[in-house]
Amino acid sequence: MEQNVLNTDLTGKVAVVTGASGTLCSIFAKALARAGAKVALLGRNMEKLKALADEIEAEGGIARGYTCNVMNKANCLQVAEEVMAELGSCDILVNGAGGNNPKGTTTKETLEKIDLAQQDPEVKTFFDLDPQGISFVFNLNFLGTLIPTQIFAKDMAEKGKGCIVMV
């Protein structure tokens, strides 16, 4: 197994990582496993989750992939039950699921007065944002963090200890 970059021993701890099939959180998951944690990999793409779990286990770690929609409380509850049965109760939660949507973002970093006067369909300003796109981004980034935290932090609260990382 590669070097433990966290420089800590997490043996016996269970880490739940949302957004684990993404670039950033897959690296976090590997680091947690290298520190000795059993890692629950939550994400939308089971193929990527399985590949990551296989990679972690090939290095001697313990990891399981779970398809999870972090905006769906019932789905998160079901996954939490599976994690508890297979790995144990959550000690560490990394909330890494999130993202953006073209309907919920502008095409330019800054607004210029000329953008208001032009009718360029390639330029989307704050004033052109689609409320449904904004709603999706809000739900993904806010509710997609709130719901897993409500579910997995309950174990931590009952134990009186734990760690939550917001990415």
Predicted feature locations:
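Catalytic Tyr-X3-Lys loop
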Residues: 110-146, 161, 165
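Structural signature of the Rossmann-like NAD(P)-dependent dehydrogenase/reductase core
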Residues: 17-18, 95-98, 162-167
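A glycine-rich helix->loop->beta "capping" turn
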Residues: 11, 59-62, 82-95, 101-102, ...
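The beta1-alpha1 cofactor-binding region of Rossmann-like NAD(H)/NADP(H)-dependent oxidoreductases
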Residues: 46-47, 67-79, 131
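Conserved glycine-rich cofactor-binding loop
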Residues: 14, 21-23
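Active-site loop of short-chain dehydrogenase/reductase
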Residues: 13, 61-62, 89-90, 114-121, ...
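A short, exposed helix-loop element centered on a Lys and neighboring polar residues
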Residues: 149-150
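Conserved glycine-rich Rossmann-like NAD(P)H-binding loop of the short-chain dehydrogenase/reductase
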Residues: 37-51
